[in-house]
UniProtKB/Swiss-Prot annotation:
GO molecular function: ATP binding; UDP-N-acetylmuramoylalanine-D-glutamate ligase activity
Uppermost EC category: ligase
Pathway: Cell wall biogenesis; peptidoglycan biosynthesis
Record-linked HAMAP family: MurD
Keyword entries, A-Z: ATP-binding, Cell cycle, Cell division, Cell shape, Cell wall biogenesis/degradation, Cytoplasm, Ligase, Nucleotide-binding, Peptidoglycan synthesis
Annotated compartments: Cytoplasm
Family: Belongs to the MurCDEF family.
Organism: Halalkalibacterium halodurans (strain ATCC BAA-125 / DSM 18197 / FERM 7344 / JCM 9153 / C-125) (Bacillus halodurans)
Encoding gene (name): murD
Taxonomy, superkingdom: Bacteria
Organism lineage: Bacteria, Bacillati, Bacillota, Bacilli, Bacillales
One Gene Ontology biological process: regulation of cell shape
Residues noted as binding ATP in the record, renumbered to the chain: 118-124
Enzyme Commission number(s) of this protein: 6.3.2.9
SUPFAM superfamilies reported in the protein's UniProt record: MurCD N-terminal domain, MurD-like peptide ligases, catalytic domain, MurD-like peptide ligases, peptide-binding domain
Protein's name according to its UniProt entry: UDP-N-acetylmuramoylalanine--D-glutamate ligase
């Protein structure tokens, strides 16, 4: 960790706990800051806050009093807290800088950072880069939105390491000096508009990944995405395009049946075991970043010939009752679910539904035309049922939760079918996380066999 005096004796408010808030509070306290932690959950039911309090950190729980901003020089905000929260609005009005925990991580890290963002594919690409860099000169450390707190990793990493960090738009929006050595922008679709307020704001948040990059840094970007290409035209970083439709000699592309990088053969398409056409982009982006950071072709070939995906992302659960079951609980938007459906040629029974963010499912209708049956749950089940009717889906069934949907999916399916959980919605109406929803799916399949 860099020895920095920039936080010493500064009065800092950490707003919202969870894992990132707890880590940020502890890091700042260790760096000599005068820290106040504020969390909505009452202290009696808040073991994280109790722990920090025992460590000598001032804790205020149960409400967000505006007076907490008095005398504060910085607010470190949990990414899940929206910018229309009254205390955040007041902080901005007072001219107090509001950042997220990844900003802290970048300020204290001795290791260079490879940062990955995009509407879809972040976790798969992050996992690929980490695996590809294993055995290279610098040890990869995974961090960020993938579930490992960035500031915890940054304080332990050395200059001999490289931090591979998945960053969301929520996290990027709270950065001002964040500067990765390599940034990847996979794609930009309509997502999280309930949080950002508009697509323009969402795009602006994604663009912050390149805001502080310089010529000696690298921007790996999707040349097939017009919005992403526009970002590439505005950055000072060295552009490294990737494309699955065009030969881009300065970057990564597919030439017939071969994955190429800067004109050099890297791996044959037939050796790549990761399923789905959408994963071609993820492979091209990951191998570009890995090669730029010193990975060998041999290691990349090994990873791509053995890496079949990550949990909750088009994860093959197994075969039960002569049906093939897939867990794609991470698919929290229409584009992800569309990509999942397009990955199969066998008949599909789709399990979908979840939090209603007020959006339409009209864009899902073309993909639903490939689906034999749907089993729908959560707040959006009626909206999705309407979309399925318009798509001409023959069998439309409603369920209460994923657990109930699994049994109903078995009932409406036949031998050889694919039963696919790909919700197209966030989980928060019924489950705390998409992981919890995916685990409920897997456990319910196991329960069918008992």
């Amino acid at each position: 960790m860099k020895h920095t005096e920039q936080f010493h004796q500064k009065h800092i408010l950490v707003l919202g706990l969870a894992k990132s808030g707890e880590a940020a509070a502890r890091l700042l306290h260790d760096l000599g800051a005068i820290v106040t932690v504020n969390d909505q959950k009452p202290l009696a039911d808040n073991p994280q806050a109790q722990k920090l309090q025992k460590e000598g950190i001032h804790v205020v729980c149960g409400e967000h009093p505006i007076s907490l901003l008095d005398g504060k020089e910085l607010v470190v905000k949990n990414p899940g807290i929206r910018y229309d929260n009254p205390i955040v609005e007041e902080a901005i009005k007072r001219g107090i800088s509001v950042v997220t925990e990844v900003e802290l991580a970048s300020k204290v890290s001795e290791a260079e950072i490879v940062a990955i963002t995009g509407s879809n594919g972040k976790t798969t690409t992050t996992s690929l880069v980490v695996e590809m860099l294993k055995g290279s000169a610098r040890e990869p450390k995974v961090a960020g939105n993938i579930g490992v707190v960035a500031s915890d990793v940054a304080r332990e990493a050395t200059a001999d390491d490289v931090i591979v960090m998945e960053v969301s738009s929520f996290q990027l929006m709270g950065t001002s000096h964040f500067r990765p050595k390599v940034a990847i922008l996979l794609n930009i679709f309509d997502a999280h508009l309930d949080y950002h307020g508009s697509k323009e704001n969402y795009v602006a948040a994604k663009k912050k990944i390149v805001e502080n990059m310089k010529e000696e840094d690298y921007f790996v970007y999707n040349a097939d995405d017009p919005l992403v290409s526009k970002v590439a035209a505005e950055t000072k970083a060295t552009p490294i395009p990737f494309s699955r439709s065009t030969v881009v000699k300065s970057g990564a592309y597919v030439d017939g049946e071969t994955y190429m990088f800067r004109g050099e053969k890297i791996v044959e398409k037939g050796d790549v075991v990761l399923p789905g056409d959408h994963n071609v982009d993820n492979v091209l982006a990951a191998m570009s970043a890995a090669l730029l950071m010193g990975a060998t072709k041999e290691q990349i070939h090994h990873v791509l010939s053995t890496f079949s995906g990550v949990e909750h992302r088009l994860q093959f659960v197994g075969t039960a009752f002569e049906r093939k079951w897939y867990n794609d609980s991470k698919a929290t938007n229409i584009l992800s679910t569309t990509a999942a459906i397009q990955s199969f040629t066998d008949p599909i029974v789709l399990l979908a539904g979840g939090l209603d963010r007020g959006n339409s499912f009209d864009d899902l209708i073309p993909a639903l035309q490939k689906v034999k049956a749907v089993v729908l749950f959560g707040e959006t089940k009626h909206k999705l049922a309407q979309a399925a009717m318009e798509a001409g889906v023959e069998t439309i069934v409603e369920a209460e939760r994923v657990e109930d949907a699994v049994r109903k999916a078995l009932d409406v399916s036949a031998n050889g079918d694919v039963i696919l959980l790909s919700p197209a919605c966030a989980s928060w109406d019924q489950y705390r996380t998409f992981e919890e929803r995916g685990e409920a799916f897997v456990t319910s399949i196991e329960g069918l066999q008992e």
